[in-house]
Curated annotation (Swiss-Prot):
Residues 1-15 form the signal peptide. The lineage of its organism: Eukaryota, Metazoa, Chordata, Craniata, Vertebrata. The gene is PRNP. Residues 83-93 have a biased composition (Basic residues). Residues 44-83 are annotated as: 4 X 8 AA tandem repeats of P-H-G-G-G-W-G-Q. Residues 216-238 form a propeptide. Cu(2+) 1 binds at G47, G48. Cu(2+) 2 binds at H54, G55, G56. GO terms for cellular component: Golgi apparatus; plasma membrane; side of membrane. This is Major prion protein. It comes from Theropithecus gelada (Gelada baboon). GO terms for molecular function: copper ion binding. It is a lipid-anchor; GPI-anchor.
Length: 238
């Protein structure tokens, strides 16, 4: 009985001390979003939350919360922290696409030809001062990359170089002519010499890579190496 009496008396005391309207969300201390005067407001501005332009609390759709589409917040327009924005996705430029093609990728529409890496145009002497000077002044108009097929499709270097020179000059001439620039007989003569040297360099590079790949295949396919690899796998698994 004594416990029941104490509990009843405590409830009556709390009812008498219950605050009148004007506490939470009225005139007293408030959460963000209440604009009534009086008391301390958190934050001090009337209306919105931290850096919010249209009222509303944390995460509200029109007051802006963390990452909300309307109003402030991290990375949203109008907030106090709008300088912290998400980085935009990098756009793939034509330079990146051209760089990928320059690594020996197969060129579409050329029947399996590949485009070699860019090279420095060789310094060539043509036997007279006029042609040497003409080449130095016009070498930028000539190709610095060659088209070629894999070396295993040719029986020797001469066949590779002959095909490489023909397709490279043809493609470069067609592409340049469409831009309104024509080549003279002197240009074609110099282009043939330049592209020939570049095709020889490309053949040597591709041949070396081809034989290295072949040597690796032969090495790993030999019986002693296969037995050694099998033994190591057995030790690891076992």
């Amino acid at each position: 009985m004594l416990v029941l009496f104490v509990a009843t008396w405590s409830d009556l005391g709390l009812c008498k001390k219950r605050p009148k309207p004007g506490g939470w969300n009225t005139g007293g201390s408030r959460y963000p979003g209440q604009g009534s005067p009086g008391g301390n407001r958190y934050p001090p501005q009337g209306g919105g939350g931290w850096g919010q332009p249209h009222g509303g609390g944390w995460g509200q759709p029109h007051g802006g919360g963390w990452g909300q589409p309307h109003g402030g917040g991290w990375g949203q327009g109008g907030g106090t922290h709008n300088q912290w924005h998400k980085p935009s996705k990098p756009k793939t430029s034509m330079k990146h696409m051209a760089g990928a093609a320059a690594a020996g990728a197969v060129v579409g529409g050329l029947g399996g030809y590949m485009l070699g890496s860019a090279m420095s145009r060789p310094l060539i002497h043509f036997g007279n001062d006029y042609e040497d000077r003409y080449y130095r002044e016009n070498m930028y108009r000539y190709p610095n990359q060659v088209y070629y097929r894999p070396v295993d499709q040719y029986s020797n270097q001469n066949n590779f170089v002959h095909d490489c020179v023909n397709i490279t000059i043809k493609q470069h001439t067609v592409t340049t002519t469409t831009k309104g620039e024509n080549f003279t007989e002197t240009d074609v003569k110099m282009m043939e010499r330049v592209v020939e040297q570049m095709c020889i360099t490309q053949y040597q590079k591709e041949s070396q890579a081809y034989y290295q790949r072949g040597s690796s295949i032969v090495l790993f396919s030999s019986p002693p190496v296969i037995l050694l690899i099998s033994f190591l796998i057995f030790l690891i698994v076992g």
